[in-house]
Amino acid sequence: MADLQAVLDSIHAELSPRLGEGKVADYIPELAKVDPNQFGMAIATVDGNIHSVGHADVPFSIQSISKVFMLTLALGKVGESLWNRVGREPSGTAFNSIVQLEREEGIPRNPFVNAGAIAVSDVVLSGHAPREAIGELLRFVRYVADDESITIDDKVARSETQTGFRNFALANFMRAYGNIDHPVEHVLGVYFHQCAVSMSCQQLAKAGLYLAARGTNPITGHSVVSPKRARRINALMLTCGHYDGSGDFAYHVGLPGKSGVGGGILAVAPGIGSIAVWSPGLNKVGNSQLGAVALEMLAARTGWSVFGD
């Protein structure tokens, strides 16, 4: 295996002059306050090593990366029947598109667009009060990261609740089609809080390890999902994890990955490790601009692309 610390150091050095590229997510007021001149990257390998560079210990809002963890929980609750309510195909449209949802009669294209993630939150909410469902997610993230210090940023959750009009529209639209079972306010309470989970690159890389190691956290030995389910979650991350930029990410990076508008990306190198990168400036489709470049550089220098080197 390549000297991963040297690889990370070289990526950081090459990207340092470009810090601040992209545009922070200004439609969520709390995210608009984030300093764009930050960059962190961490790799957690299946043999238990952690390598990091830059602002890798600074917590940030993981936003849509949380959809990976909620999908894992939902599949654990209802299994394959989840796919009666959510599709598995790339969207080709913006992550908060209503047009596609109307055309497909309230069935979201995949669990990583906002509508799909809201439907997944509805599944996790079943049998719970909203506070309990939020607690279940937080316990799960702490479990897979083996870190009890991970928290939810209430300011971010409140900020999203106050400005999330499009998400309210999506949820009400699905409710009208019978694809949301609980009160919309309860479902979105869960959704906004899951997006407000705050983690560092180091914590996030560790949390993703179960997807790199056939469903088991290799550091703790905890079995999280079956190898088959880990493989299928990775497949969805590869095809749908970057909204309408998913094909471009697969082309340039070649790894399963999930982005968030907080500027984070979680990527998985199956059998090798989990990678988290954070740079708040986003490209035009809402993915971290420098984060994607950093992962492309990493894949090129390590040969980790799932399509070969």
From Swiss-Prot:
A Gene Ontology biological process term: glutamate biosynthetic process
Binding site for substrate: 64, 114, 160, 167, 191, 243, 261
Enzyme class, first EC level, given as a word: hydrolase
Reaction(s) catalysed by this chain's protein: L-glutamine + H2O = L-glutamate + NH4(+)
PANTHER family in the record: GLUTAMINASE (PTHR12544:SF29)
Pfam families, A to Z: Glutaminase
Record GO terms (molecular function): glutaminase activity
EC number per UniProt: 3.5.1.2
Oligomeric form and interacting partners: Homotetramer.
Ranges in coiled-coil conformation: none
Keywords: Hydrolase
Similarity comment: family membership: Belongs to the glutaminase family.
Domain of life: Bacteria
Identification of the protein by name: Glutaminase
